[in-house]
Amino acid sequence: MLPLSQWLVGAELRWFRLWLGLGLILIAAVFYLSLTPVDIPAEHLDKIYHAATYGVMMGWFVQLYRGVRSHAILAVGFILMGVLIEVLQGFHPMRYFDVLDMLANAVGVLIAWAIGTTAFSRILVRFESLLH
């Protein structure tokens, strides 16, 4: 098993805890907004919002953790989060369960994972280097 420093980019990030905290706030916001009544007028745009939201979450955390295994764990976690939220929405009187929403969430996660294999995964490292 690899030491923790091999999994975290945090060794390279001066403000790792800040970035992690912002990511956790993002996750909490997604849970809150997903489980409160919201009226989105264009139903098909809803799928784009789902993919973008889950893509942003995955893209954020890909910058904090390194390695295929940790990225796979993140991807599975975010996909399961999307499934859980959809199931919970099925019990909400003003929301509904939608398999296509789950698919859109997964597509967003997978696209961000793929993009995370590029230089994109170092944006926070580069941002911090500009500030020093």
Predicted regions and their residues:
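Membrane-embedded alpha-helical segments that form the functional core of polytopic membrane enzymes
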Residues: 67-83
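Membrane-interfacial alpha-helical segments at the cytosolic side of multi-pass membrane proteins
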Residues: 51-71, 109-120
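Short helix-capping/hinge motifs at transmembrane helix termini and TM-loop junctions
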Residues: 34-37, 65-66, 93-94, 120
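Short, highly charged low-complexity linear segments
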Residues: 13-16, 87-96, 115-122
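Alpha-helical transmembrane segments of multi-pass membrane proteins
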Residues: 29-34, 58-59, 78-85, 109, ...
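Interfacial helix-loop-helix junctions of multi-pass membrane proteins
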Residues: 40-47, 82-110
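"…centered on the first transmembrane helix and the immediately adjacent amphipathic helix/loop
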Residues: 1-63, 74
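Membrane-proximal cytoplasmic C-terminal regulatory module of class A 7TM GPCRs
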Residues: 118-132
